Amino acid sequence: YRADMWKHFTAEMPELAKIPVVGTVGDKTFNAEQVVALNPDVIFIPVDLKDQYESDAKAKMDAAGIQTIYIDYHAEKLESHQKSIEAIGKALGKEERAAEISKFYTDRVTRVLDRVSKINKPKPTVYLEVGMNGPEEFGNSFSSNYSWGALATMAGADVITKDVIKKTSPINPEFILEKNPDIIMIMGS
């Protein structure tokens, strides 16, 4: 899925290449039997994939005694991030470290949101796209309440795809030309 990143990570840390590939829930390559064979104590699943995971694999995890914890980072809500950090810390026996991370993160987000709230000028219109497919193919854009779109909205942007995308999806190039956004951001993944 992110072969370019994997190539760089494994170049720096070759031992990563020894980690078994178990697939992903989102593209239905998740291999529950392989996960069970690895005998983990816990599995973390993005809350966005809860329905698919529960229909495809959760019963197998439950039968094997593997705890499932749902985490939520894509809605970009501070409270969801705090709860996810806390749940991960608790599951790993690192509650103190999780509390430190949550406090650091909360302080930084609060600082940015406070500054944004003091800006008194029109919001720039913004188009966001994950351009990991290269220039030949349009990547996913985001609604104003999901992932990069939610972050841009919190930072004071008016995301042009807010009314046409529910979460994330490629957008018709004509739409972008028609909206003529003030800012176009093409990001990596």
Predicted regions and their residues:
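Residue-level detector of structured alpha->beta connecting loops
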Residues: N39, G65, G156, N180-P181
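Short coil/turn segments
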Residues: R2, V47-K50, Y73-E76, S144-N145
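A short, structured surface patch at a secondary-structure boundary
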Residues: Y1-A37, V42-K50
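Extracytoplasmic substrate-binding proteins
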Residues: Y53, A57-E136, D158-T161, P170
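Structural recognition of the beta-strand scaffold that forms the well-ordered cores
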Residues: Y1, V42-P46, T68-I71, P124-V130, ...
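Alpha-helical segments flanking ligand/cofactor-binding loops in enzyme cores
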Residues: E33-V36, A59, E174
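Ligand-binding pocket segment of bilobal, Venus flytrap-like solute-binding proteins
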Residues: W148-L151, T168-S189
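Alpha-helical, coiled-coil/dimerization segments enriched in small aliphatic residues
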Residues: G26, N140-K167
